[in-house]
């Protein structure tokens, strides 16, 4: 039996995210983004050719999914269908922590806003 242990700090990152790309880790079937976003942070409008699942761990996220605006709280899961434009932001005064699961071996993103 073989297995892999990774540490979050070993993943590629930017200011508020760590990225796990499945194709770079024994061709794992999914990719995910580990989000730790400061108050006021946001991800601009985009879409993917596969479903994306957001697991809200701490804080509150304001999502736009298609034409719907919703507030997601810790403990909630948001499932966005393939090809549906979406974005989110942290409008609260506290950090937002969530896991964004991409049902694909790599990230494929069509950015719809600059």
Locate the predicted segments by residue.
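A short hydrophobic beta-strand segment most commonly corresponding to one strand
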Residues: 79, 94-111
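Well-ordered beta-strand scaffold positions
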Residues: 35, 60, 68-70
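Glycine- and acidic-residue-biased ligand/ion/polar-headgroup-sensing regions
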Residues: 51, 56-61
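Conserved short histidine dyad/triad with adjacent acidic residue
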Residues: 33-48
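Short beta-strand His + acidic residue motifs that chelate non-heme Fe in jelly-roll/DSBH
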Residues: 45, 63-64, 80, 86-92
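A short, N-terminal "cap"/entry segment at the start of jelly-roll beta-barrel domains
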Residues: 1-30, 111-114
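Short acidic-glycine-tyrosine-enriched beta hairpin
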Residues: 68-82
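A generic "binding-loop/recognition-motif" signal
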Residues: 39, 49-50, 68, 84-85, ...
């Amino acid at each position: 039996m073989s297995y892999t242990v990774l540490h979050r700090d070993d993943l590629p990152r930017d200011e508020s995210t760590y990225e796990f790309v499945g194709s770079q880790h024994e061709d794992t079937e999914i990719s995910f983004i580990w989000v730790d976003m400061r108050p006021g942070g946001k991800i601009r409008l985009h879409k993917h050719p596969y479903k994306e699942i957001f697991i809200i761990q701490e804080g509150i996220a304001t999502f736009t999914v298609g034409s719907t605006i919703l507030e997601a709280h810790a403990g909630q899961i948001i499932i966005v269908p393939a090809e549906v434009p979406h974005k989110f932001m942290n409008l609260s005064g506290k950090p937002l922590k969530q896991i964004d699961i991409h049902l694909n071996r790599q990230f494929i993103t069509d950015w719809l806003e600059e």
